[in-house]
């Protein structure tokens, strides 16, 4: 009897616990890239700013030093100097005090490099020349580097500057007539002069390839003081170790604790298609000599130029993985530090490189256009989002197949022009990031700015500016609450995607491009992998989800208990090979063994066969919603977002079995509801732009009440009437109080100051409710809000509307008169454009200073006024 009671007690406890929100932690809160301009930071300012960041829901700071502020050179602090290390130690102490995690870029700007990198360890490129000669007797050929040298990949730095670094590596002769012959003439070169007498006495025609290694002379981009210098050769183990030695020395000599995580930004090492040891490394890894196949590599000629190209690109991938990514991570681990890495851009198998670190990180770059109803648009002042679902899934796939708990994302890079990004514009792309498997968001980003610096303060050019100097900061805490609430669920449990999809990287490498180097940059994936992108998006549209897998991790995958299991123990229902793809004989043999054991392996996207193996999610196929599913000890949980122009109210079948289900509203962690069920289906109601968390249970759970529904058949229009508009926070200050016959945006009013102000306008009105009307529950629909709004009823704070639809559930209503107060905060666009019209010199930064979304230097005086305030209607809507 006691055992039965104990079992019942445990089941009841599990049921109660299952209905609760997962706990928050530092990692469930948002992080941000913290730009230190010139590293000109100061203790008192740091203390105040870190309190402010923490109170607004930013709990991880990734320090990235960059170029400084003009005229402030005296306050710059050299990277890794004793003073810099002292400041880092202080920041780490403040982090503990403010419950914050401190990360650190393993360099300044990007990529890795700096003053201690000698030219012989800097980025390397190949240059070559081809001479066709007819040899009758002894011949001489002057091979001194000159303008006849060709490059195989483009860089930012070409011409004489690079030619001066060219060193002859190999001279190979290929006989063009019969019999074919290849000879290595390198040893016959003295002081760049080739002297050769072929053993074949009769005249013969030869193609002579002279291969040079040169340095690209790329310098660290956006470097901070103390970080200027050459970019390292990432393929060279010695160069990487030498670079990391500088950090060992700085931390040891200054007794500074290491940060929680070291970070590496996206691979932006341009034209670095070579390394001094490549010939030996190629022969060791590929089993033949690259120098014997130079016509295939450089001219696309010969017996099998495609295979040589693939092998060359795979060798670079191997060297980058072993000599840079793994060495860097092993070094960090020796100091009990984690690594977070953006592999995109690498000339490499992205899955292997993302998987080699502790936290794979992808990047959201640009603004998606989902057509969401009511979402503000800024047609000519946004960048299109190159980071579609297929791109975002590289990092999460690597984390999933290796059992790593976190996938991070550099979020909101270059969404819009400066000063024009609203909180409402962030949510759709954030939801897309979450649906791709990301569960650790870092904002891009936050610039340290002294509190006494005149507005707009210190700015970094490509960021949304999530900082106290931006007007969106006033309501940003509600946005970061949303991030935290979503990540509490998304970091809980394990991934539960249906299929593994083989990444056909050799087919990508086989594509002959204008550059020998193939960099998998976000903006070029549509060129490098169009077929793979098409297949991934097709799988998604059929109602399934997948993770990508590479050769190395597929070779470690087994078939157990009817499931494919990666070496980390993550299970999948089947493997999809996307068509006729190139793969090694070793991998083919492994797949044959798996298939013989009964493992389902699909050699094309076969919807009927996929349907037999997994249940498609009608959330996708019927409703067109975005979603991701994870498993947990009592069932499953979904993050679901309506990134469509349509409102959804639909009963749908789920892809998993369940007994009960609940809904959690990530906009408010105090709210959850019992799901309506019918015939084994669940009811999903989401307006355009909304998101929800659905949790299923393998047991019954107590009823938590129904999800309230807006009934637009019963409304009370407050748009017209006796409104007042005043300003409590504004710059420039707006002193008048305006009486309005109906709600309208304030830049349309006649007052000069209100047209250009940045701040918070307070709309106030009084409305009445009858006893009959009070019998209803009400919500308020604020229509088109520019840009966020806090709502108060009869003096009580109701909530903040910062995302579409701008609707809040009301409380504290009463029969008779009710006082409504709506505090609307706008963007800084009107203020900054007015400053440019007056010629205020706020662009004061070194290096690139401030550029627009097209990387051009421009000013904003031509901007038309941006709507600010309530831009349409205000209605009470009955809740059912």
Predicted segments, located by residue:
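Mature N-terminal segment immediately following signal peptide/propeptide cleavage
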Residues: 19-60
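Extended acidic/polar, glycine-enriched regions
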Residues: 160-165, 169-252, 678-711, 817
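Acidic/aromatic-lined carbohydrate-recognition and catalytic surfaces
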Residues: 66-187, 200, 208-212, 220-221, ...
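Short aromatic-centered micro-motifs
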Residues: 173, 564, 620-621, 789-795
């Amino acid at each position: 009897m006691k055992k039965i009671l104990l079992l019942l007690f445990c089941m009841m406890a599990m049921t109660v616990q299952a209905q609760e929100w997962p706990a928050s932690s530092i990692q469930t809160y948002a992080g941000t890239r913290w730009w230190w301009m010139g590293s000109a930071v100061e203790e008192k300012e740091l203390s105040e700013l870190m309190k402010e960041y923490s109170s607004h829901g930013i709990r991880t700071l990734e320090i990235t030093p960059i170029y400084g502020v003009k005229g402030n050179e005296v306050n710059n602090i050299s990277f890794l100097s004793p003073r810099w290390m002292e400041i880092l130690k202080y920041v780490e102490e403040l982090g503990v005090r403010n419950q914050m995690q401190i990360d650190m870029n393993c360099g300044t700007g990007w990529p890795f490099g700096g003053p201690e990198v000698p030219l012989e360890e800097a980025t390397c490129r190949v240059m070559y020349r081809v001479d066709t000669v007819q040899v009758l007797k002894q011949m001489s050929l002057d091979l001194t580097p000159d303008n006849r040298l060709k490059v195989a990949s483009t860089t930012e730095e070409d011409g004489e500057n690079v030619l001066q670094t060219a060193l002859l590596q190999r001279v190979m002769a290929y006989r063009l007539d019969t019999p074919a012959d290849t000879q290595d003439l390198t040893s016959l070169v003295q002081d760049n002069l080739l002297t050769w007498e072929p053993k074949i006495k009769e005249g013969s025609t030869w193609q002579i390839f002279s291969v040079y290694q040169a340095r690209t002379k790329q310098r660290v981009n956006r470097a901070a003081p103390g970080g200027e210098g050459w970019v390292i050769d990432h393929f060279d183990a010695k160069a990487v170790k030498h670079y990391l030695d500088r950090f060992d020395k700085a931390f040891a000599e200054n007794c500074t604790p290491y940060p929680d995580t070291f970070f590496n930004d996206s691979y932006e090492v341009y034209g670095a298609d070579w390394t001094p040891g490549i010939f030996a490394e190629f022969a060791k890894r590929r089993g033949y000599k690259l120098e014997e196949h130079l016509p295939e590599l450089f001219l696309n000629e010969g017996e099998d130029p495609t295979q040589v190209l693939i092998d060359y690109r795979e060798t670079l991938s191997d060297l980058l993985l072993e000599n840079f990514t793994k060495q860097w991570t092993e070094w960090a681990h020796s100091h009990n530090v984690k690594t977070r890495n953006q592999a995109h851009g690498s000339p490499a198998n992205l899955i292997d490189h993302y998987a080699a670190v502790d936290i794979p990180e992808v990047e959201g770059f640009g603004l998606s256009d989902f057509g969401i109803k009511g979402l503000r648009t800024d047609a000519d002042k946004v960048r299109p989002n190159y980071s579609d679902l297929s791109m975002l899934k590289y990092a999460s796939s690597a984390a999933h197949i290796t059992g790593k708990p976190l996938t991070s994302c550099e979020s909101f890079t270059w969404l819009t022009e400066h000063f024009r990004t609203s909180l409402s514009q962030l949510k759709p792309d954030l939801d897309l990031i979450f649906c791709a498997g990301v569960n650790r968001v870092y904002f891009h980003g936050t610039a340290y700015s002294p509190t006494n610096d005149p507005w707009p303060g210190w700015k970094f050019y490509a960021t949304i500016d999530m900082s106290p100097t931006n007007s969106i900061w006033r309501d940003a805490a509600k946005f970061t609450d949303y991030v935290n609430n979503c990540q509490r669920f998304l970091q809980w449990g394990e991934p539960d995607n249906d299929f593994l999809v083989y990444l056909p990287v050799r087919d990508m490498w086989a594509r002959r491009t204008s550059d020998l180097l193939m960099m998998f940059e976000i903006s070029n994936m549509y060129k490098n992998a169009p077929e793979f992108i098409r297949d991934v998006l097709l799988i998604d549209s059929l109602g399934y989800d997948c993770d990508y897998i590479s050769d190395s991790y597929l070779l470690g995958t087994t078939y157990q208990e009817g499931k494919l299991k990666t070496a980390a123990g993550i299970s999948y229902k089947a493997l999809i090979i996307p068509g006729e793809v190139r793969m090694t004989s070793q991998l083919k043999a492994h797949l044959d063994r798996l298939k013989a054991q009964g493992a389902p392996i699909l050699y094309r996207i076969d919807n009927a066969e996929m349907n037999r193996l997994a249940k498609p999610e009608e959330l996708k196929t019927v409703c067109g919603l975005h979603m991701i599913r994870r498993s947990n000890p009592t069932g499953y949980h979904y993050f679901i977002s309506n990134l469509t122009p349509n409102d959804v109210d639909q009963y749908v079948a789920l892809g998993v079995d369940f007994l009960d289900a609940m809904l959690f509203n990530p906009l408010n962690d105090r709210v959850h509801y019992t799901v309506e069920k019918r015939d084994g289906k669940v009811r999903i109601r989401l307006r355009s732009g909304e998101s929800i968390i659905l949790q299923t249970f393998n047991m019954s759970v107590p009823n938590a009440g129904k999800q309230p529904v807006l009934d637009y058949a019963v409304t009370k229009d407050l748009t017209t009437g006796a409104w007042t508009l005043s300003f409590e926070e504004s710059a420039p200050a707006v002193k008048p109080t305006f009486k309005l016959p109906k709600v309208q945006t304030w830049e349309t009013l006649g007052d000069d100051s209100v047209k250009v102000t940045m701040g918070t306008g307070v709309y106030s009105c009084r409305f009445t409710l009858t006893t009959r009307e009070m019998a209803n529950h009400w919500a308020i629909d604020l229509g088109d809000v520019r840009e966020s709004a806090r709502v108060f009823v009869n003096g009580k704070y109701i909530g903040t509307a910062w995302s579409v639809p701008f609707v809040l559930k009301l409380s504290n209503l009463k029969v008779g008169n009710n006082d409504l107060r709506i505090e609307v905060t706008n963007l800084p666009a009107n203020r900054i454009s007015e400053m440019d019209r007056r010629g205020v010199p706020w662009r004061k930064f070194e290096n690139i200073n401030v550029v627009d979304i097209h990387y051009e230097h421009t000013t904003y005086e031509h901007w038309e006024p941006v709507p600010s305030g309530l831009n349409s209607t205000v209605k009470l809507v009955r809740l059912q």
